[in-house]
């Protein structure tokens, strides 16, 4: 069993990993909540379609697929943040960036899941009654999914940038 020895300084306090871990938790918890809500809400519409027109059930599964992808965004961000937290040097600056990245991905995923659930429920019911609405439903789902994708991209940028140094550097600037 190996023990991770961290350097503890003013820039890298012992509690820094707590904030990074909260980012990891927020990322997976909120994206899974969003995906679960989107799946549950759109499943109500799919069940209704199954009673009215059973031949449309397979076409009605798109909202469930879109909602499931949201959880994958959270999982990927969790893995990236976990790699950051498990480094021997973990600055408070890096920890706050990781917390922000987790919250960004998680809350965008939650909003996206809610949007997918509501538009998916109404969309599959409407498309069962009027098949011309199917393309409109897909466009609504794509833009709803894009909300989670935006949060995912911003979270990856936040996780990849920032200073993780535990040593203060003196910057010298020359003025003319």
From Swiss-Prot:
Major place of localization?
membrane
Residue numbers marked as site, Essential for proton translocation: 145
Q: Which InterPro entries match?
A: ATPase_proteolipid_c-like_dom (IPR002379), ATPase_proteolipid_csu (IPR000245), ATPase_proteolipid_su_C_euk (IPR011555), F/V-ATP_Csub_sf (IPR035921)
Regarding protein family, the annotation reads: Belongs to the V-ATPase proteolipid subunit family.
Function according to Swiss-Prot or TrEMBL: Proton-conducting pore forming subunit of the membrane integral V0 complex of vacuolar ATPase. V-ATPase is responsible for acidifying a variety of intracellular compartments in eukaryotic cells.
Domain of life, per lineage: Eukaryota
Write out the topological domains of type Lumenal. 1-17, 84-98, 158-176
Keywords for the protein's UniProt record, in alphabetical order: Hydrogen ion transport, Ion transport, Membrane, Transmembrane, Transmembrane helix, Transport, Vacuole
GO cellular component terms attached to this protein's record: proton-transporting V-type ATPase, V0 domain; vacuolar membrane
Its membrane topology is listed as: Multi-pass membrane protein
Tell me yes or no: is Transmembrane among this UniProt entry's keywords. Answer: yes
Output this protein's name: V-type proton ATPase 16 kDa proteolipid subunit
Q: Which GO terms describe its molecular function?
A: proton-transporting ATPase activity, rotational mechanism
Record-annotated membrane-spanning stretches: 18-38, 63-83, 99-119, 137-157
Question: Self-association or partners: how does it assemble?
Answer: V-ATPase is a heteromultimeric enzyme composed of a peripheral catalytic V1 complex (main components: subunits A, B, C, D, E, and F) attached to an integral membrane V0 proton pore complex (main component: the proteolipid protein; which is present as a hexamer that forms the proton-conducting pore).
Gene for this protein?
VMA3
Residue intervals on the Cytoplasmic side: 39-62, 120-136
Q: Where does it live in the cell?
A: Vacuole membrane
